[in-house]
């Protein structure tokens, strides 16, 4: 398993650029583009690289402020959600990081905030250090669509991670409409897995096809009996009718085969669900996989009725780029 610095890191990064997150306004990003904050990859240092405005930095960096005030950016999250925690990452910013930062939030069902929008502070001003991660749990029980990220008074931040549970208004989904119940944009969440040595389990629920092999879930080579697996909580209970297992970019390291189990889980913690998953019913019997391809299954799927969770088993190990679970919502 990959080590998580804090428990809330296992939740979806709502501020991931791959989900569509972007800044809709910023007071100043003279030295470094504010949208670098949302890149899924860790920040990097490029020795001796300069552009027209100065040293190239992997993050958001404003000019030195010579007047009263502070810098801020208004961010539209790629997917609204309930925020569990944030990481304000100042990697490689040493003599140019902000001494402190804060976060405000709002929910706008359609469009972007206006002058009349009411913002709520969800993270009071916290002290920042250079070249460091700053993890903070968030206690706010309402969904958030936009953030205002304030830095005092100026400076640079490498990444802003906003971990939480995605929100979707399921009342707008038609009774016979087929949707991807596992998609991160629809509230799907990877809960646990046997191993994620090379790639995070949450990647398999991202939109679009994978950008490269790193944009997927990949386990270490298995040297003991057994197989690898990942458990996914659906965004909404539903009846699964079609499954897509995509091994894009995985050529010499794709699984030989896969199967899927499923259940309707009414309660329990993530760790309890992990144990229960051993006994879930079979949704998709073992299917052969091939390299670098989308595999679609429909006729092979068992009619289990409504389910809330699935367990993807891969045999014996390897990498999967995306998992799609299409079905109808059960209300």
Swiss-Prot record:
InterPro entries: Allantoicase, Allantoicase_dom, Galactose-bd-like_sf. The gene is alc. It catalyses: allantoate + H2O = (S)-ureidoglycolate + urea. Keywords: Hydrolase, Purine metabolism. The keyword Hydrolase applies. One of its GO terms (biological process) is purine nucleobase metabolic process. Pathway: Nitrogen metabolism; (S)-allantoin degradation; (S)-ureidoglycolate from allantoate (aminidohydrolase route): step 1/1. Belongs to the allantoicase family. PANTHER family: ALLANTOICASE, INACTIVE ALLANTOICASE-RELATED. This is Probable allantoicase. The lineage of its organism: Bacteria, Pseudomonadati, Pseudomonadota, Gammaproteobacteria, Pseudomonadales. Its EC number is 3.5.3.4. One of its GO terms (molecular function) is allantoicase activity. The keyword Hydrolase applies.
């Amino acid at each position: 398993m990959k080590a998580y610095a804090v428990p809330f890191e296992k939740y979806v990064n709502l501020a991931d650029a791959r989900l569509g997150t972007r800044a809709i306004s910023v007071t100043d990003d003279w030295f470094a583009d504010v949208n670098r904050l949302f890149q899924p990859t860790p920040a990097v240092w490029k020795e001796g690289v300069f552009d027209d405005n100065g040293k190239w930095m992997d993050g958001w960096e404003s000019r030195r402020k010579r007047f009263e005030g502070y810098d801020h950016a208004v961010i539209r999250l790629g997917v609204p959600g309930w925020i569990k925690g944030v990481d304000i990452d100042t990697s490689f910013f040493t003599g140019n990081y902000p001494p402190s930062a804060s976060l405000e939030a709002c929910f706008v069902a359609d469009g972007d905030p206006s002058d009349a929008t009411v913002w709520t502070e969800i993270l009071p001003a916290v002290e920042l250090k250079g070249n460091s991660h700053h993890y903070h749990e968030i206690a706010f029980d309402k969904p958030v669509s936009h953030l205002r990220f304030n830095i005092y008074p100026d400076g640079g931040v490498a990444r802003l991670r906003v971990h939480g549970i995605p929100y979707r208004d399921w009342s707008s989904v038609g009774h016979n409409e087929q949707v991807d119940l596992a998609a991160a944009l629809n509230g799907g969440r990877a809960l646990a897995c046997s191993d994620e040595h090379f790639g995070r389990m949450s990647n398999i629920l991202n939109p679009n096809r994978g950008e490269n092999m790193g944009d997927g879930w990949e386990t270490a080579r298995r040297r003991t009996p057994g197989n690898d697996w990942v458990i996914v909580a659906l965004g909404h209970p539903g009846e699964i009718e079609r499954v897509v297992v995509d091994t894009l970019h995985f050529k010499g390291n794709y699984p030989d085969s896969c199967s899927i189990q499923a259940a309707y889980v009414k309660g329990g913690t993530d760790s309890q669900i992990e144990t229960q998953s051993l006994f879930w019913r079979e949704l998709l019997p073992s299917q052969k996989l091939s390299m670098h391809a989308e595999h679609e299954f429909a006729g092979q799927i068992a009619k289990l009725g409504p389910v809330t969770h699935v367990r993807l088993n891969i045999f014996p190990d390897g990498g999967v780029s995306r998992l799609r679970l299409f079905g109808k919502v059960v209300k």
